[in-house]
């Protein structure tokens, strides 16, 4: 979850009161093979993971469903009552007609619920066997799991397909090579990738929550400033700053002069379809539309390589630094003696920023051993896949591509890779607090307006999302699971 979706700025010129709406880019069909994770074609049937024979059938006609149901009933009865009961069961099931459909659906739901519980339990058993070096059991469980997972099934089946991919790679000690292959093999076209990210941006409020909460803290800190410099350590498509520029434009007394320094590497350049100049030109066009004095500076280097001289800090400018979904990519002391994670925070503190915003996934996978890391990943992404399932129909022809290109790589990397090759290294907010405190930061209080604004945003989504403020931070969760945390520092 690290690629930032792009907002089409032109959409805001004609709909100033609907700043959260995005316009989808057209999607070009692509049938290129995506290494171990194969993209979903625009026409059925769905394609599953190429490294295993997954059952990716998402539905059939009523007759086939009835026959499948009869077959499952026969199997259950045969096991429970013995072969003598089979003939009786055949006679009974053959008499089913349309009036029994409600009863059939009830049984089917029960069987599916049992299957889901079994799948989760089997995934855990497989990971546990691997952690105990029980290779025979692990291989046996993988064969069983291949018949249970599906990239077009229920949330746990879809997530299970990617978890299994990671388990297979971890067992084969090929996690690094698989993840590198995922990054080397042909991506979908830029417009397709942008479309997938747009869909994820729209169906889940995670990005919007992060951007709105960070922007609220920056707007509050800069409300009396006339010259504002914002350093964004992963600017991506620059979409976060659309609403902030508009908010500054409406500020009583006129907008400040805004300078944005955008940092990014070639990973996001592909998704943009070009370099950071695309972002700068787009934001400059928007700022001009709203009569906001604007300047953009680009820094095309990896975040871990950024030096103070790259940032162009000027006297007389109020400085804001934004860390949205980026710090978890920085290796810490458990990976490298350079400890870029803490070094970067100390460097930013030396710049004397007025406010620093942090948005991160609320997950604990950084230094965890393999088995607890697997459990944390399964529980975290199960909540995320369930939230997608509520908004994006399972028969949506781009849903599989959204999950594969925007989420699956992260899952595979966390499960399969070790050392420096594991770049997805999330920490809980408590650990981030410790790091910021050691770097010399103190908490910046949240604005009540931010809380109420995000609550209004969540009304457009499922009531299973929950917003909680505690200990000076905002948490966005799905049911009982925290997924994203946001806070500010000074």
Swiss-Prot record:
Keywords, in A-Z order: Cytoplasm, Transcription, Transcription regulation
Lineage start: Eukaryota, Viridiplantae, Streptophyta, Embryophyta, Tracheophyta
Record has Transcription regulation as a keyword: yes
Gene that encodes the chain: PAT1
Family matches, as InterPro entries: TF_GRAS
Protein name (Swiss-Prot/TrEMBL): Scarecrow-like transcription factor PAT1
Function text: Probable transcription factor involved in phytochrome A (phyA) signal transduction.
Cell compartment(s), UniProt: Cytoplasm
Residue segments, region VHIID: 197-262
Region (SAW): 416-490
Family per similarity comment: Belongs to the GRAS family.
Protein's UniProt keywords contain Glycoprotein: no
GO molecular function terms attached to this record: DNA-binding transcription factor activity; transcription cis-regulatory region binding
Region spans: Leucine repeat II (LRII): 278-310
Motif VHIID, residue numbers: 228-232
GO annotations of cellular component type: cytoplasm
Leucine repeat I (LRI): annotated segments: 117-178
Domain spans labelled GRAS: 110-490
Disruption outcome: Plants display reduced response to far-red (FR) light. Seedlings develop long hypocotyls, unfolded cotyledons, no significant anthocyanin accumulation, and greening after FR light.
Region (PFYRE): 319-413
Biological processes, Gene Ontology terms: callus formation; photomorphogenesis; red, far-red light phototransduction
């Amino acid at each position: 979850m690290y690629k930032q979706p792009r907002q089409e700025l032109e959409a805001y010129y004609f709909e100033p009161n609907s700043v959260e709406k995005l316009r989808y880019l057209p999607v070009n069909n692509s049938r290129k093979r995506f290494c171990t994770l194969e993209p979903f074609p625009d026409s059925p049937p769905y394609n599953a993971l190429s490294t295993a024979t997954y059952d990716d059938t998402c539905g059939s006609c009523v007759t086939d469903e009835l026959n499948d149901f009869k077959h499952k009933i026969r199997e259950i009865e045969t096991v429970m009552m013995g072969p003598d009961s089979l003939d009786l069961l055949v006679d009974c099931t053959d008499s089913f007609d349309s009036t029994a459909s409600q009863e059939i659906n009830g049984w089917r739901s029960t069987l599916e619920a049992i299957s889901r519980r079994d799948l989760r339990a089997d995934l855990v058993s497989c990971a546990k066997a691997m952690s105990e070096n029980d290779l025979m059991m692990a291989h046996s469980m993988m064969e069983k799991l291949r018949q249970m997972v599906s990239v077009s099934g229920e949330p746990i089946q879809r997530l299970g397909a990617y978890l299994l991919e990671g388990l297979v790679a971890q067992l084969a000690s090929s996690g690094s090579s698989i993840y590198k292959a995922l990054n080397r093999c042909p991506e979908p076209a830029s417009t397709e990738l942008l479309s997938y990210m747009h869909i994820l941006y729209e169906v889940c409020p995670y990005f919007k929550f992060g951007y709105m909460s960070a922007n609220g803290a920056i707007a509050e800190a800069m409300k009396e400033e006339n010259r504002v410099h914002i350093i964004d350590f992963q600017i991506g498509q620059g979409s976060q700053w659309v609403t902030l520029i508009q908010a500054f434009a409406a500020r009583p007394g006129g907008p400040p002069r805004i300078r944005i320094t955008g940092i990014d590497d070639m990973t996001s350049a592909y998704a943009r379809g070009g370099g950071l100049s695309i972002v700068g030109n787009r934001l400059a066009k928007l700022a001009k539309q709203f009569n906001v004095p604007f300047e953009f500076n680009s820094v095309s280097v990896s975040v871990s390589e950024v030096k103070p001289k790259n940032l162009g800090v000027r006297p007389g400018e109020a400085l804001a630094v934004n860390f949205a979904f980026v710090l978890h990519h920085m290796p810490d002391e458990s990976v490298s003696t350079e400890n870029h994670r803490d070094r970067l925070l100390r460097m930013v503190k030396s710049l004397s920023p007025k406010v620093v915003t942090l948005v991160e996934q609320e997950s604990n996978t950084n230094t965890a051993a393999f088995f607890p890391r697997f459990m944390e990943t399964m529980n975290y992404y199960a909540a995320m896949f369930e939230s997608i399932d509520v908004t994006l129909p399972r028969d949506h022809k781009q849903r599989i591509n959204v999950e594969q290109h925007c989420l699956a790589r992260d899952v595979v990397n966390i499960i399969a890779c070790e050392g420096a090759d594991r770049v997805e290294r999330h920490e809980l907010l408590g650990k981030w607090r410790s790091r910021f405190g050691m770097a010399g930061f103190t908490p910046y209080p949240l604005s009540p307006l931010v809380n109420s604004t995000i609550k209004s945003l969540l009304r457009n989504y499922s009531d299973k999302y929950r917003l909680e403020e505690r200990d000076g931070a905002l948490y966005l969760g799905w049911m009982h699971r925290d997924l994203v945390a946001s806070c500010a520092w000074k």
